[in-house]
Each structure stands twice: as structure tokens, then as C-alpha cells.
Amino acid sequence: MFCEKAMELVRELHRAAEGRLPAFNEDGLRQVLEEMKALYEQNQSDVNEAKSSGRGDLIPTIKFRHCSLLRNQRCTVAYLYDRLLRIRALRWEYGSVLPSALRFHMSAEEMDWFNRYKKSLATYMRSLGGDEGLDITQDMKPPKSLYIEVRCLKDYGEFEVEDGTSVLLKKNSQHFLPRWKCEQLIRQGILEHVLS
């Protein structure tokens, strides 16, 4: 059946939970592109035959194949675009370093796009707020308090707070730190927010 493989790509993303990135389906995408190539070649052959011999009975078949080509194209673009939106959201959620499990699900082109997006965002943030720039990825929601209690999940080493004091982050140690300094480490899984 025409367009089934393309629809399966879209269904695959639809079934994935919000914020999750399923593995890049290179094989499915290749099958869709091969189907599109076959449809295009069949259409070209029928168009040439219809022109040369004046066969009007081929027109509905040509139109049907053309509609199938357009549907395959829309599904493919929707699949790739939705993946890029999810990858962009991952940059805001995890920061500039993605966990290896997420990188494993991305194609080489998607990793390249992520790196270019990351650099573009970093350049923009450096252009804001004076010498140090402004990190717009912090405080995605307004904080209720400026300091939070955190527990260290992994040995991290020394961590410098903005006033110059250093805190040693060892596994299972608890600290009271500025929220904006630890949000990145919370996203990376080094710290966890202790809710009292």
C-alpha cells in the first residue's frame, strides 16, 4: 500500500512519550525514499507515454501517484521536523551536554544540527548582558526561592559559588546552594533537589 511506511514513521513519533526521542529510523526513511523514487520513475514513464501516444487513461493513475508522492514528502518532512523540535527541546532541558543514551538515538546529521544550534544559542547568550553574557536557559520557571537544598548523587569535586567560596560535592553530601548555580548539575543528574 502506498504511503504506509511514511505513515509508520509519523506513528512512531506519535507513540513516543512527550520529551522522549526514539531512535532515528534510518531504514524506514530509506524505504520511504525508495518508494518515492519508484513512484516518480513510474510517473515519468507514464507521462512520456501519455504525451507521445495521447493516452488520456493514464492521467488518473499519474495523479494518484503524484498525490502519494506528496503525502510521502509531507510525512517525511513532519518526521524530520518533529525530531528537530524534540532535539531543540533537549538542549533547553539538559544543557549543552546530552546524555549518551540520547546521543545514541540521534543520526550524525541530527548531532551536527544540535551542535550548530548549541553554538548559535551560546553566541546569542554571550551577546546579552555585558561581559559575561546572560544564560537564558536558567530559571525556565520563576524560582520560589533563590537558594535550594541539594543532595549530591555522584562524586563531582570542587564547585565554586559566585561569592568565591568552594564547596566539595561528594556522593550523598547535602548543600544549600544558589538555585541558578545548581540547575545545570540537577539536569545532568549530578545533584538532586531535596524537597523538605
Swiss-Prot record:
It comes from the Eukaryota. The keyword Nucleotide-binding does not apply. The keyword Lipid biosynthesis does not apply. It is found in: Nucleus; Chromosome. SUPFAM superfamilies: GINS helical bundle-like (SSF158573). InterPro entries: GINS_A, GINS_bundle-like_dom_sf, GINS_Psf1, PSF1_C. One of its GO terms (cellular component) is GINS complex. Belongs to the GINS1/PSF1 family. This is DNA replication complex GINS protein PSF1. The lineage of its organism: Eukaryota, Metazoa, Chordata, Craniata, Vertebrata.
